[in-house]
Amino acid sequence: MGNHFTILIPSYNVEKWVERNVTSALNQQYDNYDIVYIDDCSPDNTFGPAKALLEEAHDQGFPGTIKVEKNSFNKGKMCNVYESIHAAKDNTIIVILDGDDWLAHENVLSYLNEIYESDDIWMTNGSYTIEPTGEVVRPMISDDYWTGTMRKKSWQFSHLGTFRKELFCKVKRKDFMNQQGQYWTTTSDQAIMWPIAEMSGPDHFRDISEVLYVYNRLNPISDDRVHRQDQLSTEQIIRNKKPYAKLERL
């Protein structure tokens, strides 16, 4: 049966890309996975097409569990991701697919399953293609990257980020929040990936050169376009947090 995966799709105002996004998740040639789709109170028509596609797949015998919901108010990606991961099945592997992006091909989960066949692998990050330029971006993580404080180094833990649920759950909730106790409104990737990478260390991490993800740069409301200052200030706060200690076991 293979490892169990949960594809988590946090979405907001992405109606132009719903079909491509959701279809890339549904078309995986793999049986043991769930899909969780969260529309964060989009004012556009994101939810309707997503709900229709996912409900149709369910009715046609999709092998896993499908959850699709629309928030009554905007919670932000960080809150949605945190709550959804904690509600996911135990022993699942989380695959975060942003609502305006898509998986690169139908064998992404099969590829990841081979990597996670080793219990020693707790997390991965990978390579992606930029839409529309076609540029391929790959992680550049040398042995030296793991020495010292990685939060002070260049950001390397980008798409596609995957990890075991149990690893994520070891990150303190307060580290996903500002001093007022509110979830970060931007920069959730760094808030997630740095702590779990610190706990994993190189022995429990795998960087992937295979392109598994398409990163869509056509979205005019992406955080780096409309919330750049908040993104930069939040990143600095996260960089300055105390690193997590490396774990010997999950």
Model-predicted regions and their roles:
Residues 1-250:
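Nucleotide-sugar donor-binding/catalytic module of glycosyltransferases
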